Amino acid sequence: MSRPLAALAAALIGLTVTLVGLTVNVHDAEAATEQLPDLRMRRLTNFYIQQASNGDKRLRFTTRIANAGPGRFELHGYRPDTSTARMNIRQRIYNTSGTYRRIEIPRSSTYMFFAGDGHNHWHVHKLQRFEIRRLDANGNEGELKGTGAKTGFCFWDNTTYNLSLPGAPQTAYYTSCGTSRSVNVKMGLSVGWSDKYSASLAYQWIKINGLQDGNYRVRVIADPYNWFSETNDANNGTWTDIRLSGGGTKVTVISSS
């Protein structure tokens, strides 16, 4: 082989090696796919009406927020010192290689705050929304009649949802939401796990003062403003139709989603 041809062959071999190396890197990047969470609200349960000492009528019920996605739902709160009342929030999105990227959530959207309401831990502002609407004779939703009193939510792996989902840990991974002295807080929901807020907990109610007897729809939505990244924003809600009677002293469940 002549010297020019040999040089050309060597160059082509080098180019091939380089291209193969590039191809491997591209494939490695493609293999590391992101695993987003998928937030859902489970069926509402344990409805009852509380007559408060101040005269309010409170419709109480139990909620459960669940993660049915391929990836964990993980939020990190942080503040510079303990004198700062609110924490900024970052969401971590993990991928199949075990690394992650961070998404900064604007403070104007939401934040974490500490609540000494018997829970004594950090909460995400407006992670869920409760509402009640009147139903007409055909079962169609009418105007909004009330919203939930609760504005902050802590969440961790405290009840199982579906441990047969791929990647679901068989034991709880997220177990707390920090203390009043925390400057960094990690809270989350693992794949296949859910967080339960019992009907009796602080602010777990909708005020129903003045509502006439009749049929209503109670709806609860997770991440109602779509601040957080997940696989599907269209399946975040659940509803239950109820009947109020006895001048707002009795509640009966009619049907649920």
Locate the predicted segments by residue.
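Bacterial N-terminal signal peptides that target proteins for export
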Residues: 1-12
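C-terminal region of N-terminal signal peptides and the immediate post-cleavage residues
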Residues: 17-33
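Beta-sandwich strand segments
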Residues: 32-38, 70-76, 138-146, 198-199, ...
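Boundary/junction segments of secreted and surface-exposed precursor proteins
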Residues: 32-76, 251-255
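Short amphipathic, basic-aromatic surface patches that mediate peripheral association
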Residues: 60-121, 131-139
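Exoplasmic/lumenal beta-rich domain surfaces
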Residues: 127-128, 136-212, 250-257
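A short tyrosine-centered beta-strand micro-motif
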Residues: 130, 211-222
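Short beta-strand elements
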Residues: 230-257
